[in-house]
Amino acid sequence: DESLHFDYLLVASGCENRISDRAENVLNLQDFAASAGSELLMPLLESNHQSEQSISVVGGGATGIQFLFEIKQFLSRKKSKATLRLIHSGEQVLEQFPRGFDTYVQSRMQELNIAFYPNTYYRGQQSNTILLAEKHTQKHIELSSGLTILFLGKSQRTPYAANAFGQILIDQTPLPNIFVAGDCSVYRSVGSNTLTAQSAVRKGKLVAHNILRHSGLPGLLEPYLHPDLGYVVSLGSADAVGWIGTENALITGLPALTLKELVEAQYDLLLAG
């Protein structure tokens, strides 16, 4: 053990990826970060058992949904007859977003013949079979799956509570020289606490400024008031669903893709300062 003296401490430990046991024919987000998607998918499509080709995507959050539609588009380009399905533990997809996201996405899945298994838990993979369990009855299900791709989301540790200035609270008392930012924090303020890059970056910039202010002009700290700018989930290269400005104004299709570019441009500007 070692003790370090500090003037200010910033905790920004974030969230961990949910980890599942790796098995044959199973991929996750890290695999796609390390290799091109086509390199990962083509071995399945080039197999001789055309009638048995099937891909299972596990996880109906934003990442899983965006990969699901990109994979469907890739299969269409390759004129593949491989079947595609989504496994999700919840009743609806994109449950963290406003109502309307789920119905639009699920209607597009139906149009594209993507099978949907809601309220279903992933148990594992054995060779070319995915092992599932029905959420309410615990009934075990086995389906053919030549490739299973896991997008299990983030696992948030017990978050640190903070006041509106980003100072950690212990028994409702702020620690003046210890700040927290990112996904591991919940601010007691009107600002957004969603687990998104937007919120994490804005909290980080705020506490950086507040540390400088506190070290020079005690008491003149800035509160965290930033709302979400918007959020767009892409559904392939020609479709999307999202909102910007107000959560009640749902936008779909090509206009939503345009908004996605605007939101990402705003995020890039935010990172640039």
What are these regions (language model features)?
Residues 199, 203-273:
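C-terminal, flexible cofactor-proximal segment of oxidoreductases
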Residues 28-51, 142-205:
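FAD-site-proximal beta/loop scaffold in flavoenzymes
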Residues 10-11, 149:
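N-terminal Rossmann-like NAD(P) cofactor-binding module of classical short-chain dehydrogenase/reductase
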Residues 76-165:
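A Rossmann-like FAD-binding core segment of flavoenzymes
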Residues 25, 83, 113-115, 177, ...:
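Conserved beta-strand segments of alpha/beta enzyme cores
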Residues 11-74:
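Glycine-rich dinucleotide-binding loop and its adjacent helix/turn
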Residues 53-104, 197-210, 219-223, 229:
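Rossmann-like dinucleotide-binding core of oxidoreductases
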